[in-house]
C-alpha cells in the first residue's frame, strides 16, 4: 500500500482544545474556544472526534475568560458576549412548542438568542458553489455576517483528516457545530473564523495579472501565436489556462472523456518545452482537471497505478477521494508528474458532490506544500466549506448577459461575508447570449476592479474575448483597462498580503461601514476595493 508523503501528516494536537475549556457528559461535549466562539457536539453513542476536518484547521485556541455554573442537570457558561444554558445530555433539538428548551445561547444585553434549528433569517449570505446557467437568481449559502450578531456553521458532515493525512467519512450520528456570537464585532468574528479554519494563503503575484482561457483545441504552436498576438497588441498576459483538450482524448470524438491527466502529444509533443517557453515570457500555465471519470488505460501512468491496485484487465480505475491508497497513487502518479513538467495551476472543474470537491481541493493544496521552487495553486468551483483555503474560486460557466454582469459586483461583495477574496469570473460571460461591444467593455472595466481578471469563453469564433478582435474603439478602451489592471498589481499584492496575514478581504461591502444602507438599492452593487 502506498502512503501519503510526510507533508500530509497533520499535527493532531491542533485538533485538541485545552481541558480547561471543555465540558462533557455521556452524550455532549461543549468547548469554549473564544469569548465569541463555541463548539457544540452531541452524539447519542457518546463518541467525539478530535480529528481536524476540511473545515477546521485548529481548535487549540488560547484559553478565554468565562464563568461556568453547573450541577448534575444544568450547565451555564457566560462570557462577555453570550450566556449558554443547556440541560445536560439532552438532544440539542428541543420540543416543537419550545425549540430552545434544551439548549439556548443568548447574546448579552440584547433580546437575541440562538437555538439549534433556528432559521437565522437575518444572515447576509456568502456566495454559491457556482453561477452555472445563472438566470437572474441563485441559491446563496450562509455567510458569517448577520444583523442578529450570530451565526452557526455545521461541521457534522464534513470529511475528517486522519492521522495519516487521508480523508475519512465522519460519524453519521454526530452533531458538530461552531457557533459565533459576536454582536456587532464582525472583525473579531472573522479573526475567530480564520483561527479556526486557517488563514488564507498568500496567492502568487502572477495571479493578479490577466488570465486567458478559451475552450478551443490549442496546440503548442497555437499558444505561441496567441502570446505573440497579445504582445503585438501591447496587452499584458500572466496566465494561460488550457481547457480539457490539452489531455489525451478519443481521436474519433474529442467531446468524449472530460477526464485526463496526460498531455495529448499530437498537440503538445514536448510539454516541458511548452511550459518553459511560457515561463521564459513570464506566463504561467494552468490545466483543466475533472477527475470524475477516473483513470483510463490510455494514461501515461496507468500501469503504475493499476499494478499497485492489482488491476490486470485494463478497466478504468474509478476516482474515490475516500480511498487513501488510491489517492496516494493519484498524488504520486497524476499530480506530481504535471508539477514536474512545469504546470502552475490546476483548474478543478469537478461538478458533482461538494464533499468530494472539498476532498479534491484538500489533496491538491496539501500536495503543493512540498513544492519548493514554485508556488502552484488551484482554480476551483467553491466547495462552500471554508472556501478561502483553496486558492482561487471559479464561478462556473456564466451566461453572456447584462443580468449576469449586473449581479457580479453584488456577488463579489458577498464573498467577504464568508471571509473570501479570490473569486474569478468569466470576462464577457462564457456561453449563450448575444455578443455586444458595450457589454464586453463593461465586463472588462468591472474585471479591472475585481479580485481576478480572467478572459474566458466557450468554443466558437462567435465569442470574441481577444480585445483586438473588436472594433478600434472597443479595442482601445479594453486595452486601457488591461494596462490599468497591470499598474494596479503592486496595490493588489499589498492587499493580498494583508488578507493573508490579517484576514482583511480585498473587497468589503459598503454596509460593513454603513449598515443602515444594506437595503438601499443604489448601494447594492458598490464595494470597497482594498483599504485605500
Model-derived regions, located:
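Catalytic and substrate-binding clefts that recognize carbohydrates or anionic sugar/phosphate headgroups
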Residues: 62, 68-207, 213-215, 220-222, ...
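Aromatic-lined carbohydrate-recognition surfaces of secreted/lumenal glycan-active proteins
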Residues: 211-213, 242, 283-296, 348-352, ...
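Glycan-recognition surfaces
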Residues: 300-333, 339, 363-469, 501, ...
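Aromatic-lined carbohydrate-binding/catalytic grooves of carbohydrate-active enzymes
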Residues: 201-354, 388-389
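Beta-sheet entry/capping signal
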Residues: 29, 37-38, 74-76, 83, ...
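A low-complexity, Ser/Thr/Gly/Pro-enriched, surface-exposed linker/loop concept
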Residues: 8, 33-72
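Carbohydrate-binding surfaces of carbohydrate-active enzymes
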Residues: 2-24, 31, 229, 233-234, ...
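Generic, well-ordered alpha-helical scaffold segments in large soluble proteins
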Residues: 192, 196, 226-229, 233, ...
